[in-house]
Amino acid sequence: PILDAVLSLKYYTMEHKGIRFEHSVYLPTAFPLSPLDTSTLFTNILDNAIEACQSCPAAPWIHLDIKPKGDMLLITLSNSSAANYRYNKKGNLLSTKDGKEHGYGLRQVARVTEACGGFYQVTPSADKFTITIALPVSLEVERNNL
């Protein structure tokens, strides 16, 4: 239910901003995140995508794909991008926002992902940004729910 609430709220925001949103969501019976971590993860990746789309003048879009694969839940979010990326000396992405209140989104994604034994990868390109998140799904819990 919390994922539905986050997606509905962000869909409304995207619609209001003229961003095309496509999604495909297949959830396992044993969802690997708490409601708080679910909200944190999806709010951050969707907010980042919405912000990036605002710098794309023509036909901004976001695509979200959530599906189980083996013992992992794969979350892939891609969005149109104007490629205005900033990096630190280590090659890590930096926030495009100014001020100390900004730049926590990817750190929160990393915290949530790593806390449950998962990982994430970002793939910025000239016209698209993709984040792929893999979260382990407990097969024992899933079998017990059958």
Put a short name on every predicted segment.
Residues 71-103, 142-144:
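Glycine-rich/acidic phosphate-handling loop/turn and adjacent ATP-lid/helix
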Residues 1-17:
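Short beta-to-alpha transition helix within the HATPase_c
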Residues 83, 125-132, 138:
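Glycine-rich nucleotide-binding loop
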Residues 59-71:
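Short beta-strand/loop element within the Bergerat-fold HATPase_c
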